Design a protein with these regions (language model features):
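Bilayer-spanning, highly hydrophobic alpha-helical transmembrane segments
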Residues: 191-212, 235-250
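Alpha-helical transmembrane segments
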Residues: 180-186, 213, 254-262
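N-terminal pre-first-transmembrane
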Residues: 87-90, 94-97
Length: 279
């Protein structure tokens, strides 16, 4: 019974740690800056009695549209990366299996197996690294090309053509994956989006004060025939302004994490180790 309790506590602790990691993965220094700006903006609005019924459509265009656009683009890049990596791995596996059933010597079959592993290993190293040096990757791909040229005599004419097509798919998959790593979503849109997220609390605080009531006047709730009840909405205004800013900057952080789906920064990044596994 004691062991069962210990197992339960360990499982509960692991679950809580995973949940904590899950919900804090999008938090960084921008989150703190955004929260501080929200508090300052709300304090400023109360300090100078700023209370306006402002139209939020303008700020929606400035913040929500570019945020949704860049977030959608980042997820599309991730899906494309999965597609290109899958194509490259599948084509490499097909090349290896074609030679494994050919009349090539066992030594050559072992060599193509090692070269396929080398290409996958070098591709993963390159995508994970911050460097743009792909010389080792290019050499490993060239080795497979040279191997095919050297051993095509063991394949029929039609099979040789198919192998070269598979090699083309390998190169296309690798190059497209490299392009996704090097080229990001439009940086100007992301820069303006971040700027407007920081400006938004100064625009939103006076609107909240106008809609929820000034601290000096109170906010009417539960009005009945017998009378009304009032309470101070200062805390509510502060909380709502912080919450909306927190949501916006968290979405921005998520977009930044999946901007490069290969760097391992974020829960939604591609697990490249899976592409090194053999069928």
């Amino acid at each position: 019974k004691i062991d069962n309790n210990r197992i339960f506590l360990v499982c509960l602790l692991i679950f809580m740690l995973n949940m904590f990691k899950k919900y804090t993965s999008a938090l960084n220094f921008r989150t703190l800056i955004s929260v501080i700006i929200s508090l300052i903006a709300t304090w400023t609005a109360y300090k100078y009695n700023l209370s306006f019924n402002l139209d939020l459509t303008l700020i929606s265009i400035a913040v929500v549209f570019p945020l949704v656009f860049t977030l959608g683009s980042a997820f599309q890049r991730r899906e494309k990366a999965l597609e290109h990596l899958g194509r490259a791995k599948g084509s490499l596996a097909a090349i290896k299996y074609i030679f494994s059933v050919s009349k090539a010597p066992d030594v050559e079959k072992k060599r193509i197996d090692d070269q396929v592993k080398e290409v996958k290993s070098e591709l993963i190293k390159y995508l994970y690294s911050e460097s743009n040096d792909k010389e080792a990757l290019n050499i490993s791909i060239s080795n497979i090309k040279l191997f095919i040229d050297k051993n095509k005599e063991f394949l029929g004419r039609s099979i040789s053509v198919r192998v070269y097509r598979l090699m083309r798919d390998v190169i296309m998959g690798v190059e497209n994956s490299i392009s996704i790593k090097l080229h990001r979503t439009p940086q100007t849109i992301r820069a303006y989006c971040e700027l407007f997220i920081y400006i938004f609390p100064f625009y939103y605080a006076p609107t909240l004060i106008y809609n929820l009531g000034n601290a000096a006047l109170g906010f009417e709730i539960g009005a009945t025939a017998g009378g009304s009840e009032y309470f101070d909405t200062t805390f509510l205004v502060y909380a709502l302004n912080v919450i909306i800013s927190f949501i916006l900057i968290s979405l921005y952080n998520v977009q930044e994490q999946i901007e490069n789906p290969f760097d391992g920064d974020g829960m939604d990044d591609i697990q490249l180790e899976n592409y090194e596994l053999e069928y």
